[in-house]
């Protein structure tokens, strides 16, 4: 028996990696709270699923609060009265209500404290419901990705960084020369 092909990708752009409603199971474990837009990651995952496909989430509760919003910890994943919430200081979304009609959401806080959500896509409709369309905007996505790439390029090719890298290389090269 052959195992299914396993794909990896950024949840916020998952439908670019997994196309044509082809996936039957997508798992996101302790990653949504580290992403730039976790609700978009959920919706992109649902776009990639076939009808009846499952998005399985397993997260530590409210990590951004615990980590004081440092580094990648910018969002909290929580369960309230059996419903899934994504929130931070400025933003709170009841994901269960947001996805109503497009997907069913079963959320539970486990004995170990983890938040487990099983989200099942109800339909294979090509058109996203209006309340979900605002999270998926290809033009905006391209702009954001270009901005990230340009910032990365700037941060890694600035004159100061080039000089620093050049000096570091020369020092390393000199040490190696004398070590031989």
Task: State what each model feature region is.
Residues 1-14:
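Class I SAM-dependent methyltransferase SAM/SAH-binding core
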Residues 4, 54-84:
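Conserved class I S-adenosyl-L-methionine
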Residues 13-21:
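Short amphipathic alpha-helix with an adjacent loop that forms part of the alpha/beta core around
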Residues 27:
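A conserved beta-strand element that flanks and buttresses the S-adenosyl-L-methionine
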Residues 33-35:
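A short His-aromatic
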Residues 39-54:
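A short glycine-rich, Lys/Arg-flanked "PGG" loop and its adjoining helix->strand segment in the class I
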Residues 75-103:
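Short alpha-helix
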Residues 137-180:
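Boundary detector for helix-to-coil junctions that initiate low-complexity/charged tails
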